[in-house]
Amino acid sequence: MQRNGLIGDTIRSLGFLSRLPLPQGWFDNTDDSLPRNARAFPLAGGILGLLAGVALLIANAISLPPLAAALIAIGALAAMTGALHEDGLGDTADGFFGASTPDRRLDIMKDSRIGTFAALTLVIWTGVKASLLMAIIARAGAGYALLALIGTEAASRAGMLAFWHALPSARPGGLADSMGQPQWETVVCGCGLGLALLAIGFLPSGGMVALINALVLMTVVLFGFARLCMAKIGGQTGDTLGAAQQIGSLAALIGLVMAL
C-alpha cells in the first residue's frame, strides 16, 4: 500500500490533529512532512466529526435532551483532539486582548496558564456551538446534526490550511515556523476535499442556501481574522491556526442554521 498516498496522509494528519490510537507503521519510512500531509487535514477533520456525530446520535437515542447531546459531541471532539484547537483559541484571546504590543502578545500566547479572556471566549464559544447543534437537532434531526459535524469539521480545517498558507509566521524560529508552510497545490487539494465534505454534510438538510451561507461566512470571518492577526502580531502562529479552525467551524454551523 502507498504510505505516501492520500490514505497515508490522512492517517498522519489524524496523528497530528488528534490523540486517536493509530498504527505506527503508517509513520515509519514515509515523507511525513506536515505541510505536505496537510492536504488531508479536511479528511481527518471529517473523521473526527463523524465520531463526534456518533456520540451525539447515541446520546439522542437514549433520550438525552438536545443540549446534553450537543455538549457530548463537543466534548468528544475536544477529547479526541486533546483540545488542540480550543487551546489555540483561548491562547489567542488572551494574547490579542491582554497585551498592547506584539512581543508581549506572543509571550502571553506561549504561557500555558489560562486568563480571563481565554476563559470567557471558551465559555461563550461552547455555549454558542451547543445552541447551534441543538437547533439542527430540533429543526432537522440528530442524523443531520451528524452530517453537519462531518462537513463543519472538514471545511474548518480546509479554512485553517488556507489561513496557514496565506499568512507569514509571526514567530521566526518557533514551532510553527520550523514546520514550514503548505504549498499552493496542497491548499487547493485540501480546500477541494473540504468543499466536497461540506456539501455532503450540508446539502441534505439545508440545500444550496446552507452551502453558500457557510462558504460566504467562513470566507468573511477568516479574512477578518487574518487581518486581525496581521495587526496584532504580524502573522500566524500555531495558536492562531487553532483559533482559525474554531472560528471557521462556528461560521459554517451558523450558515447551516440560517438555512433551516
Curated annotation (Swiss-Prot):
Record keywords, A-Z: Cell inner membrane, Cell membrane, Cobalamin biosynthesis, Magnesium, Membrane, Transferase, Transmembrane, Transmembrane helix
NCBIfam families: cobS (TIGR00317), PRK00235.1-2 (NF001276)
UniProt-listed HAMAP family: CobS
UniProt entry tagged with the keyword Transferase: yes
Function: Joins adenosylcobinamide-GDP and alpha-ribazole to generate adenosylcobalamin (Ado-cobalamin). Also synthesizes adenosylcobalamin 5'-phosphate from adenosylcobinamide-GDP and alpha-ribazole 5'-phosphate.
GO cellular component: plasma membrane
Keyword Cell inner membrane among UniProt keywords: yes
Cofactor: Mg(2+)
Pfam families attached to this UniProt entry: CobS (PF02654)
Database matches in InterPro entries: CobS
Highest taxon listed in the record's lineage: Bacteria
Reactions this protein catalyses: alpha-ribazole + adenosylcob(III)inamide-GDP = adenosylcob(III)alamin + GMP + H(+); alpha-ribazole 5'-phosphate + adenosylcob(III)inamide-GDP = adenosylcob(III)alamin 5'-phosphate + GMP + H(+)
Gene: cobS
Main location: membrane
GO terms assigned for molecular function: adenosylcobinamide-GDP ribazoletransferase activity; cobalamin 5'-phosphate synthase activity
Family membership noted in the UniProt record: Belongs to the CobS family.
UniProt name for this protein: Adenosylcobinamide-GDP ribazoletransferase
EC number: 2.7.8.26
Source organism per UniProt: Brucella canis (strain ATCC 23365 / NCTC 10854 / RM-666)
Pathway in which this enzyme or protein is active: Cofactor biosynthesis; adenosylcobalamin biosynthesis; adenosylcobalamin from cob(II)yrinate a,c-diamide: step 7/7
Residues that span the membrane, as ranges: 42-62, 64-84, 117-137, 144-164, 192-212, 214-234, 240-260
Protein topology in the membrane: Multi-pass membrane protein
Biological processes per GO annotation: cobalamin biosynthetic process
Subcellular location: Cell inner membrane
